[in-house]
C-alpha cells in the first residue's frame, strides 16, 4: 500500500504517479481528502477516466460552506451533492468502516 500526498492525474505532463500505478498493475484506488467537490472529485474523475476503479470513503473527505451571491450552501450539502454525483458513475462511495473491513 502506498499513500500519495497529492494526486494529480489530470495534468498530462505529470505522469509519474500514473506510470507508477500502471507499472505495478494497480487497478483500484482509494481517494479521499479536502474539498470534496473540488480536489477529491477532480482526482476521482481523472482516475476513472484512466480506467481505475475508485473507492471514496466519505467520512475521510470534507469541505466547507460555499457562498454564491447572497446564498450560503452548508458544507454538509456541498459534500453530499459531490458524493452523490460521483457515486455509481465515477466511484463507489462507502463508509470508512466498510472499506477497512474489505481491505482486511
What are these regions (language model features)?
Residues 1-104:
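Active-site-adjacent betaalpha module
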